[in-house]
From Swiss-Prot:
Keywords: Repeat. GO terms for molecular function: RNA binding; zinc ion binding. It holds the Pfam family PPR. This is Pentatricopeptide repeat-containing protein At4g21065. Belongs to the PPR family. PCMP-H subfamily. The keyword Repeat applies. Residues 501-595 are annotated as: Type DYW motif. Residues 394-469 are annotated as: Type E motif. Disulfide bonds: none annotated.
Amino acid sequence: MSPFSETSVLLLPMVEKCINLLQTYGVSSITKLRQIHAFSIRHGVSISDAELGKHLIFYLVSLPSPPPMSYAHKVFSKIEKPINVFIWNTLIRGYAEIGNSISAFSLYREMRVSGLVEPDTHTYPFLIKAVTTMADVRLGETIHSVVIRSGFGSLIYVQNSLLHLYANCGDVASAYKVFDKMPEKDLVAWNSVINGFAENGKPEEALALYTEMNSKGIKPDGFTIVSLLSACAKIGALTLGKRVHVYMIKVGLTRNLHSSNVLLDLYARCGRVEEAKTLFDEMVDKNSVSWTSLIVGLAVNGFGKEAIELFKYMESTEGLLPCEITFVGILYACSHCGMVKEGFEYFRRMREEYKIEPRIEHFGCMVDLLARAGQVKKAYEYIKSMPMQPNVVIWRTLLGACTVHGDSDLAEFARIQILQLEPNHSGDYVLLSNMYASEQRWSDVQKIRKQMLRDGVKKVPGHSLVEVGNRVHEFLMGDKSHPQSDAIYAKLKEMTGRLRSEGYVPQISNVYVDVEEEEKENAVVYHSEKIAIAFMLISTPERSPITVVKNLRVCADCHLAIKLVSKVYNREIVVRDRSRFHHFKNGSCSCQDYW
């Protein structure tokens, strides 16, 4: 007997029968829902019936994404008096889930104005989800105050929604305030605040929170692991990352593709290319993200030719289509290996074969490709031919290349463009000052310094991070705040002496102060990465590898010094600066002095 037959209809009151049909067939498709809706109208059920409308709206909103919200709203608009808050909540939830926060808020305001119903414990989490989609922290604060006034602020799932809202909006201070005031914190709360710190430039705080969570006996899940690995990758906390890897193996999370991809990214971003390749080979399942992660990882670590070979293998055997990010990695590899011709060929293939329209990042790679090869005039012509306005990164790339290759006129032009887009970035002033200093144009150096003072621009201090055990140590230039400072500086003195015996002469051309040579030499001796390496030499076993994460570009003097340290002390040293990795071994660097 058909569920829509007249005989079966007579067995139950019509509204109840239609609701039963919805419960039986409603989750299958929009077609079934339309049939049941039409069936109800044909058999005399009023289109304003609230009970049937409630169920129909629920099943419409519950359909696979994207649900037919316009249809659901039409059903809602026909209900004469929607006095059931469930109906309002369902529609608000539907709009929040598809990212239509404007309609969600419009419906909420309509609810308050109508006076038919009051928001309940479920209304605000759905509304907060809509704010989260908008990433509007001010509106979120308004909703937060309404939640408190309504008496729902102590409910854990409301608190978790608020916590996620602030973290997603980048307001980690407010997120932590909500978290700190929660009398009971479940795993969802810990995950939200850890991820908030990890994704908003506070990886150290994320790791500290994980340590606290672990001490309270709360077991991490896959979401925690992803956030934790992301934080480890950002500050080069390889030891902790490896511990997380061991935990993943123990609980079976290595079978989770997303977690494995993030772990792969960790090894690549910590300069551990061999571990990344081993993990990649061991992964049972791989997607385009896996391949792209390793391709980009090889590229930024200076193994550009390997990155290109891996890309060719992916194309020929795996049947996976590269994405925009894959080509960023390939173009980056060509740029940092000086493969200009190959870079232009891959750019052509991206557009013509894969129909990927280049974004600003791809054009930036092409400018970098020419600029690094010393073709700064061609790089400038390429910028002028771009179909979009160059951003500050592209002009900064040109400025950096001009300072390296000594084109002061074009460097000054690039800086003028940068000043219009981002006037107070100290690195641009420093680049130009370095170029003037290398040319001994001290009056121009002084002009730049005076302009920095006049504009209130302060140079970003260089810092270097290293990890010993499970602790990350930070060093600044000339830093003597570390408890082992005396031993560190004694090692630094010994290190400098041994390097001099190998023929090391400090590279001081970019020390942009017109002072005596000895003072300039002292200035470069105490750069943060040298202090960090001296600390690692006294804190780790002989011949063990050293990893340093630096926030600025490695200067020419430190690059030369670290090459010699790797030879004299028989250490493999990986330095991740703001643009790439340098693998120092036996007196040479993977960048082949091309950075």
